[in-house]
């Protein structure tokens, strides 16, 4: 069985067409979506480099090159792009699909727009922002970033002097003010959507995430323009696609839904000034910021019918303010055998001067997870390798180089198995490391009766070079279990597999061609997240389970002694709360605060926020159990964050912001967003 996180992840590459503002009721439309899903699970084999790019080398499971080096397209020529998209669309129809216009939109929340913070929670490993500014003398926590120097977006940010909070699609800018935060300004979402029965009109916008870089603020937004969809359909009013009252039945297609990065000058926090808004049609897979450069990774499915004379019908749109254009032909690289009419696009923006995109690179394909450091971006896509009688998980890897905003597709490879999340990947000293879980299913047809049999899952670790050739591996580990968390730290890797107990594997990666298992520790439960906690210690956050039945029995903190990698031991553990207690941090690393210097471990537990300290002698100690309001939770907010500025600890909730003294965690103030 797939890990729950991976069930969602596998759908990400087609999520622009899986959900709509209203449930899709067309059987033909559902069939089309299923066809595209299968298409995304096909094998990608070859890439066509654009002018001036280094020819790529690829690797299959055995490390064999899979890349053909064909002539790049000229900037003005979309003919080969059109031909391949046309072929893919025809295959969809042949397999029972229907290019019904207007059913595919990006992944939506319960209210019809994406949930805030979904993309990617507080690196509270201490220290301030990497950006210089007036608050440099302040001591404050940062977002829980995977890679040092690479910022990840979140719903709450601070630079020590100010706090920036995304709340229900809006953004508040506040002066920190020593525990008595003062709202200075508010940026409101645009929402002109109206409903008449099943029909929807207007524009729906939601601010999902925030980046801060000195006096620049970037808001990651989702925008669905239903009116633009109707304008597009006006000339086809005689068809059933355009309702008589001028509204859209199912919502705009992916081509008219977009994610944007709105860049603001916040020199005066009381009056933020919009400098530009840049974006692309489709779904935002993820984003990262390195210095002042923002990198956006998109997936775009081509909806509806296509017209060779109109590239906007089969090429992703780029948005610069109110202007719209298509990705240039010479920025598109053709895959030899993509499974669906879908693009994967990486774009860059200089937030200091956001007049235009610095660079854009697009390939035919899709993605689900990314790993990013200051020089390299790797996009992973879990697919299926299928024959008539066997299907196997496979992860395609696309490696881009990043240099001052220039994005260059360098190499492509693949490994067996599916990837859990971004922490399953890492690059160190020029080598890319990845852990995967593989499902293998055999299909039988005896006497006209079809059946299937799944092998026990197997887990693998692979080391690849910069050409994405496999140079080292450890395969077939922990049969019947799945990877639940991973962390790479220099020459050492840690990963957790689980079925009934939690084996924590420690791997020596100092010789890339010969990785080896140093130790395997089995303890009850499993860690969903691993985080270094000073020298020789590794924190595990996850869930406890019964050793016999495997039944989940609440949350668990573990501290592992890693001072001797060959004899890793669980030094202390702490079981939390009731049997079915849940934490949003289980699936979102940004909801966890870990600061070994301040001896703080924070995370939400249902609708409360827990704070622990750790002692090598006595283990974990609970130091606070916080709620937004003094008389208890009072609401059902689960998407909580904790962060600190100097000696004030803040609890963020979708309902408000509470401040506490870090001396004794007594309440200083409570601010409710609605007041």
Pin down the residues of each PLM region:
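Beta-sheet-rich non-transmembrane sensory/scaffold domains
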Residues: 44-675
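Membrane-interface helical sensory segment of bacterial ECF anti-sigma factor regulators
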Residues: 15-65
